[in-house]
């Protein structure tokens, strides 16, 4: 059966109340996203390191799903009135019912990162048996290799990582960079994330790839420094975590930063140049990667 999907742009004062009201009046689901995601104005998502425990985007979009025959317009009007909103504008579209598992799988083919590095979902055969194949399925934790920032970090690991080096992947998400580091020759690799679900996903993905990776919440990360520190997170946490990431990098060790937009690279470079001699930024599809060596 088809579904109705409704999108409403609102501010942070009413986003959660509106989503709750829509659910109370019959929406099948209601999600809140950053209205500026993917732009220079995007904000750190819930739970980014250093941010308040309770946080929502200043400009959000509420995305609600309704059944085919639900009176979506009436429900939206009722929910808007309860939230003190008048003349609430929204957009709508029809989503056809499909085999969502099969459709999702069809959208994720193997991804070639370099001459020797592939990311391959479990339902696909490895394109090249002799290549380095990362077995990774799309899931709830960020990081499947399809995003430019992930590819930028993977390319750095593929070309710059030395055999036997230790690697810290801060903000590891699915664990893709931690796992890739081990498959590319790292002697020891640790993934850290503030999300317990990401830590679990990292452990599961490491097991699927037959590598001995360790994953921790930030408070559980053992003391020590690393040859390579990778942080593929957003610009705001990168601003706040600079001193800590530098302290975790050995003298002469290297840092790799991504998750920032091209136009944010100069500012972030100015911050990290306090501790690192930085290489020229690399960019892909409007996203940037910074790397450098600790003095």
Curated annotation (Swiss-Prot):
InterPro entries in alphabetical order: Ribosomal_L11_MeTrfase_PrmA (IPR050078), Ribosomal_PrmA_MeTrfase (IPR004498), SAM-dependent_MTases_sf (IPR029063)
EC number(s) per entry: 2.1.1.-
Coiled coil: none
Amino-acid positions noted as binding S-adenosyl-L-methionine in the UniProt annotation, renumbered to this chain: 150, 171, 193, 232
Keyword Transferase: yes
Keyword terms of this UniProt record: Cytoplasm, Methyltransferase, S-adenosyl-L-methionine, Transferase
Catalytic activity: L-lysyl-[protein] + 3 S-adenosyl-L-methionine = N(6),N(6),N(6)-trimethyl-L-lysyl-[protein] + 3 S-adenosyl-L-homocysteine + 3 H(+)
Keyword Disulfide bond: no
Listed Pfam families: PrmA (PF06325)
GO molecular function terms noted in the UniProt entry: protein-lysine N-methyltransferase activity
Gene3D superfamilies in UniProt: Vaccinia Virus protein VP39 (3.40.50.150)
Taxonomic superkingdom: Bacteria
Cellular-component GO terms for this entry: cytosol
Compartment(s) of residence: Cytoplasm
PANTHER family cross-referenced by the UniProt entry: ELECTRON TRANSFER FLAVOPROTEIN BETA SUBUNIT LYSINE METHYLTRANSFERASE
Stated role: Methylates ribosomal protein L11.
Family to which the UniProt record says this protein belongs: Belongs to the methyltransferase superfamily. PrmA family.
HAMAP family: Methyltr_PrmA
Name of protein: Ribosomal protein L11 methyltransferase
Gene (name only): prmA
């Amino acid at each position: 059966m088809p579904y109705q999907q409704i999108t409403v742009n609102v501010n942070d004062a009413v986003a959660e109340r509106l989503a709750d009201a829509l659910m109370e009046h019959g929406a099948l689901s209601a999600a809140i996203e950053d209205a500026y995601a993917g732009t220079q104005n995007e904000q750190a998502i819930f739970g980014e390191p250093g941010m308040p425990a309770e946080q929502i985007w200043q400009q959000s979009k509420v995305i609600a799903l309704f059944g085919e025959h639900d009176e979506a317009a009436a429900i939206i009007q009722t929910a808007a009135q309860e939230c003190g909103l008048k003349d609430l504008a929204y957009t709508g579209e029809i989503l056809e019912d499909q085999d969502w598992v099969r459709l999702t799988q069809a959208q994720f083919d193997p991804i070639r990162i370099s001459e020797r590095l592939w990311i391959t979902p479990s339902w696909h055969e490895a394109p090249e048996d002799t290549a380095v194949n990362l077995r990774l399925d799309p899931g709830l934790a960020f990081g499947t290799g399809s995003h430019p920032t992930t590819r930028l970090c993977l390319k750095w690991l593929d070309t710059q990582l030395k055999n036997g080096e230790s690697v810290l992947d801060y903000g590891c998400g699915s664990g893709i960079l931690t796992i890739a580091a081990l498959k590319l020759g790292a002697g020891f690799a640790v993934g850290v994330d503030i999300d317990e679900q990401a830590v679990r996903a990292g452990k599961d993905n490491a097991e699927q790839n037959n590598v001995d990776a360790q994953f921790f919440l930030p408070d559980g990360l053992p003391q020590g420094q690393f040859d390579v520190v990778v942080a593929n997170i957003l610009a705001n946490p990168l601003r706040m975590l600079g001193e800590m990431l530098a302290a975790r990098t050995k003298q002469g060790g290297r840092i790799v930063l991504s998750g920032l937009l091209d136009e944010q690279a100069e500012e972030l470079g100015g911050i990290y140049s306090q501790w690192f001699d930085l290489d020229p930024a690399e960019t892909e599809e409007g996203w940037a990667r910074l790397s450098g060596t600790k003095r």
